[in-house]
């Protein structure tokens, strides 16, 4: 007789969990109790759920699991940034990075192992695409990090404990790790709903950000299903250049993308879209590009986030000099465009989208020795 795969409760949003419990004759409040045990208390054992009936716990133990991805490595930077490398099988791995700041703690999570969008400046795309992550694997990154960080914070508060950033816990989540979230929509959506659910993580929509390269139809769906804060990987002020840097632009050009952004704003928790713009020396950082970008930005309520590029050999690209970035940013601000320059965090542990995952692929796939480095995950202003 073939064994039935047990349900991983990490991947079930409130509606799905209520349906499962209802199939066993349970009431909706039992599902809410169970959800709080899993996501708020971080329980990984049904025996620990002492306010649930013994028979119910036995049913859960037979049919369900609470299981995050295995952790290959964990690293910590001198600035407090922490990075986990999760094993997704077949020699592939994804990264999750926690960035503590004075006023927030931001967790950057992945939605795919690899990426199909293949932006020219991103090493993750050069590595290719392995598979979509399941909802349990997406939310499992948050579940794991929350447990680790809260345990560290509890320890730091003890007499003689270490104060400071050790007490910072997760207040914001950004989907800016590996992958294009909107190309894994059916798994990303329940993960987002769990992040917002008061019986799970209870984050406000303003504190959860999805970053997309511009999958227009799915932007429209997200605006209806779960309108969290939105960041768009722009990186070019015109179609000709964006076609080269972000190949998806050939399918969804800027006029369609900007129209989708405007539609999204009707439902968004913030009154602006964040445009991400990776600064590439001599490619998209000239005064003319700044003028074009100003005209584009005036079409949509937005803010610009300029990102210094971290070169990798396969890209053939260079980082814009710091002086050029400052001049570029000043031109935008002088035109009334809210502009920030992302600050690098976690340099000493290579806290980078896909970077260490690429190294894992190198070690396990001899034919992919040309997989190289990537753009660091840096300070995120969600």
UniProtKB/Swiss-Prot annotation:
Enzyme class label: transferase
Ligand binding (S-adenosyl-L-methionine): 179-180, 211, 233-235, 310
InterPro entries, per the entry: Aldolase_TIM (IPR013785), Methyltransferase_A (IPR040072), RlmN_N (IPR048641), RNA_MTrfase_RlmN (IPR027492), rRNA_lsu_MTrfase_RlmN/Cfr (IPR004383), rSAM (IPR007197)
Cofactor: [4Fe-4S] cluster
One cellular component term from this protein's GO annotations in UniProt: cytoplasm
Cofactor annotation comment: Binds 1 [4Fe-4S] cluster. The cluster is coordinated with 3 cysteines and an exchangeable S-adenosyl-L-methionine.
GO biological process, alphabetically ordered: rRNA base methylation; tRNA methylation
Disulfide bridge partners, by residue number: 108-353
One Gene Ontology MF term: metal ion binding
CDD domains to which the protein is assigned, alphabetical: Radical_SAM
Active site: 95 (proton acceptor), 353 (s-methylcysteine intermediate)
Listed Gene3D superfamilies: 1.10.150.530, Aldolase class I
Role description: Specifically methylates position 2 of adenine 2503 in 23S rRNA and position 2 of adenine 37 in tRNAs. m2A2503 modification seems to play a crucial role in the proofreading step occurring at the peptidyl transferase center and thus would serve to optimize ribosomal fidelity.
NCBIfam families noted in UniProt: rRNA_mod_RlmN
UniProt record similarity statement: Belongs to the radical SAM superfamily. RlmN family.
Note in the entry: Reaction proceeds by a ping-pong mechanism involving intermediate methylation of a conserved cysteine residue.
Name of the protein: Dual-specificity RNA methyltransferase RlmN
């Amino acid at each position: 007789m073939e064994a039935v795969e047990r349900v991983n409760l990490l991947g079930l949003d409130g509606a799905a969990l209520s349906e499962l419990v209802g199939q066993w004759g349970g009431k909706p409040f039992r599902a809410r109790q169970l959800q709080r045990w899993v996501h708020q208390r971080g329980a990984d054992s049904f025996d620990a759920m002492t306010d649930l009936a013994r028979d119910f716990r036995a049913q859960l133990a037979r049919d369900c699991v609470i299981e995050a991805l295995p952790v290959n490595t964990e690293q910590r930077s001198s600035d407090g940034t922490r990075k986990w490398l999760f094993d997704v099988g077949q020699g592939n791995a994804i990264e999750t990075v926690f960035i503590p700041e004075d006023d927030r703690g931001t967790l950057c999570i992945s939605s795919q192992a690899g990426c199909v969008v293949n932006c020219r400046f991103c090493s993750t795309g050069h590595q290719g695409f392995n598979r979509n992550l399941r909802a349990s694997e997406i939310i499992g990154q948050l579940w794991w990090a929350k447990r680790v960080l809260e345990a560290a914070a509890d320890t730091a508060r003890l007499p003689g404990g270490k104060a400071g950033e050790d007490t910072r816990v997760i207040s914001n989540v950004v989907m800016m790790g590996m992958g294009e979230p909107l190309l894994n929509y059916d798994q990303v959506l329940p993960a987002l709903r769990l992040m917002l659910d008061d019986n799970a993580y209870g984050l406000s929509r303003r504190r959860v950000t999805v970053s997309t390269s511009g999958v227009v139809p799915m932007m429209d769906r997200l605006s209806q299903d779960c309108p969290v804060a939105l960041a768009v990987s722009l990186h070019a002020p015109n179609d000709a250049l964006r076609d080269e840097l972000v190949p998806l632009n050939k399918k969804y050009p800027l006029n369609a993308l900007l129209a989708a952004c405007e539609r999204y704003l009707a439902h968004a928790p913030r009154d602006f879209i964040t445009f991400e713009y990776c600064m590439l020396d001599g490619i998209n950082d000239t005064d003319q590009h700044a003028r074009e970008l100003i005209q584009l930005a005036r079409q949509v309520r937005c803010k610009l986030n300029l990102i210094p590029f971290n070169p990798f050999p396969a890209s053939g690209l260079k980082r814009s000099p710091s002086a050029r970035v400052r001049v570029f940013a000043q031109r935008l601000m002088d035109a009334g465009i809210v502009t920030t320059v992302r600050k690098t965090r976690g340099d000493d542990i290579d806290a980078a989208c896909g970077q260490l995952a690429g190294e894992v692929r190198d070690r396990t796939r001899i034919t992919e020795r040309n997989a190289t480095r990537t753009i660091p995950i840096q300070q995120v202003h969600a």
